[in-house]
Amino acid sequence: MARARLLFALSALVAASTTVAACSPSVSSSAPRDPFAAPIVPGQSARASAGSGGGHGTIDAPTPRSGSGTVTVALVGGAQLPTETAQEFTKATGFTVAVVPVDGVDAVAKAEADVVLGLDGADALQASAAGTVADAAPQDTTTLAGTAVDGAPAAVAYGRDDVCVIADKSWMSANNRPLPTSFADLSSPRVRALLAVPDPASSSVGRAFVQEAASQTGEGLGTFVQSLSPRVDATLGAAIGAWTAGDRVSDAYLSEVVGSASGASGAFPLVVAPRSLAAAAATNTGADSFGAPVSSTCIARIMYAAATTAPASDGAESLIAWLQGETAQRSLATTGAAYPIDGVLAADTKASWLMGITGEAVVADETMGSLDAMNAWLATWSSALAAPAPAPTTEPAPEPTTEQQASPAADPAQDEAGATGDDAADSDDEE
């Protein structure tokens, strides 16, 4: 009897196992063990999010030299060399890195650097003319087609990071302010007092903004600047600190920006900054940002590296060569430090999700041009800000009639909406 019970139990167990197997889907051995180990990107599967490698690079990058010692790197105008990227360089070559942030190219000489990162075309021309960078590119580097800077042969392209107006999307929406869709919108009554700008006289980022303003307004640059009511800060870091989403920017990013303060935020929802700021202000998912580059205000900028001496030190030459390689390009894209000049490596990274760059990575650097013209635009900016447009005047109103005297008058203070970020929010609450 006991034997019969045992046989019956075994038969039931086999039947149950067969039923479960028939109802259970098979799981591929290549499926990720934890499908939520990486943030899910809208429109992309969990598997792609967790396992995508971004493809292979297309640049025939040279092999960087190996060695020892420290390479001192000047980072211009918000350019980034994230810690994880620097560690990859050390692992590959043996050289270590020390970074010195500077706000503009005029400050590079004081940094006593071996190599400069983050130069745009105008910076490269200015640095070359001043003798701040070498007069030739290191021998173990590649100048990509379409990126050579006539007049600055030492400049070697490694990425792209346009300068734009970056909007705090949440603030603009909550306070019923329209996002600008053109440069002209920046001077509209409900927007013009919401902008923070790093000083173009000392900041490469601020200078690039003035160049784009001049390009879009032509001979009307002075009039346009007079119609603005911007906050002008001494450095890019100070401008980010005045941004309403400034406290959303990562400490890692701020540590490489002159004049920045961790956790600082202000009353200005629009700030002139590189596109990489949007990647640095990413939400917890990593797939969205508190900041949105306003594409109609952007000026295209290629990021260049240049050695400060010729011949370049072994460490400087090694870093410049390494930055063009697949590991470095992918690291820059993954961290959102820059859009890689090897555009295929941007796939499924912060750079592609948040920087707002579409199409080819290599484009004409729109900052390049006559240094004399640039100086003239900067002079126009300064003089226009010093003499803002006069307040509009109206003809004297006729004497009110008896009926008009009995009616309440409109408050003229309501004619101009929002002189500052805080005032703008208050006026909306009253509405």
Set out the residue ranges of the language-model regions:
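Extracellular/periplasmic juxtamembrane helices and adjacent flexible linkers that interface
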Residues: 23-46, 314, 322-431
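Periplasmic solute-binding protein
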Residues: 121-130, 151-178, 208-216, 300-306
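Early extracytoplasmic/lumenal segment of secretory-pathway proteins
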Residues: 23-27, 31-126
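A bilobed periplasmic-binding-protein/Venus flytrap-type ligand-binding module shared by bacterial periplasmic
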Residues: 166-172, 300-315, 322-323, 331-337
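Short loop->beta-strand "edge-of-pocket" segments that line small-molecule binding or catalytic clefts
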Residues: 184-216
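Short beta-strand->loop
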Residues: 133-143, 154-157, 184, 269-270, ...
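Ligand-binding pocket segment of bilobal, Venus flytrap-like solute-binding proteins
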Residues: 202-205, 211-297
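A structural signal for short loop-to-beta-strand junctions that line the ligand-binding cleft
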Residues: 62-64, 112-119, 133-166, 184-185, ...
